[in-house]
Amino acid sequence: MSGNASSEAAKAIVRRNTEEVQGRGNFDVFEELFAHDFVDHTPQPNTTPDKAGVRRLYAYLRAAFPDFRAEIHWQLTDGDRVTTYKTYYGTHEGPFLGIAPTHRRIHFESVDVMSVQNGKITDHWGVGNLLSLMQQIGGWIPPADAPQQKLKK
């Protein structure tokens, strides 16, 4: 497969994970897409940095936000790595990080990098704007007396 064709195939695998696993909760597809020895280099709290930990995280998110879905804004490839910038959406219908359901609609941005080798997702690095999510469900409210600082030029 040419470099461009393999890049497009890798993007399609990551997109399929985003749409079918995260967005629809299809864990049969999860088993198909993730390598047995998958490593999450930026695991979330209370998860393990392996395939089981990511499966647990995805299931937890779908329980808290049953209509969880993502809008992919763009994807780039570099070798076997696919970087995806997306916005997640959902409705807070289940407990999340100790916060009871608020039934509020949420959204937050995320950037993920996934390595794809031999048609399988082998590695993940990612950052998500969880502070924004927590603010939307009342999990973090800045104190009224918090000092306001101006940025220096």
Q: What residues fall within each predicted segment?
A:
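C-terminal and inter-domain tail/linker signature
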Residues: 1-153
